[in-house]
UniProtKB/Swiss-Prot annotation:
The keyword rRNA-binding applies. It comes from Nitrosomonas eutropha (strain DSM 101675 / C91 / Nm57). The lineage of its organism: Bacteria, Pseudomonadati, Pseudomonadota, Betaproteobacteria, Nitrosomonadales. This is one of the proteins that binds to the 5S RNA in the ribosome where it forms part of the central protuberance. This is Large ribosomal subunit protein bL25. The gene is rplY. The keyword Protein biosynthesis does not apply.
Amino acid sequence: MPIEISANSRNLHGTGANRRLRIQGRLPGVIYGGGGTAQPIDLDHKDLYYKLKTDVFHASILSINVDGKKEQVLLRDVQMHPFKQQVLHIDFQRIRQDQKIHVKVPLHFINADIAPGVKLSGGMISHVATEIEISCLPKDLPESITVDLSEMTAGSILHTSDLKLPENVEIPALLRGDNQPVSTLIMPRGGEVADESGEESA
């Protein structure tokens, strides 16, 4: 089920109108794209502020109810106050079920504790990336991509091309030939030398 949010349409624009909305605890925003016209909206600031703290809100299809009319959207941009805990503006993009969407989804790492490089060699896994941009139809959008680290050995590098993707999901960067590292297994300084010395002394 999509995450649901409620909004009101708004007719007043500009800095002054937006400031008055914020004083009232409302958050100005806009819905655009999907073949429709841009729709200025306002939302409850407190509700959106806490929703924005969750990864799933940033990487999921959202159902937004504007004056009783529901649309499916993606979160596209958030403008934060430079030093206050306040959202200044928020942008949503309409989606169409027959068109692919590009979304950054979180990477969910598993089995790091049983990786040979960790369990047997005392190494440490470093995550170069914690999210990745994917392309798919809205119906195929996953909440996250699972990254299995169970086979990582000392000094190994897990690349984007090593990720196991759900069906009908692509990584645009790979289509451009951009195969970036995702995780690396780093040995502690002097770890390998100590192991070799131990074997020799034995």
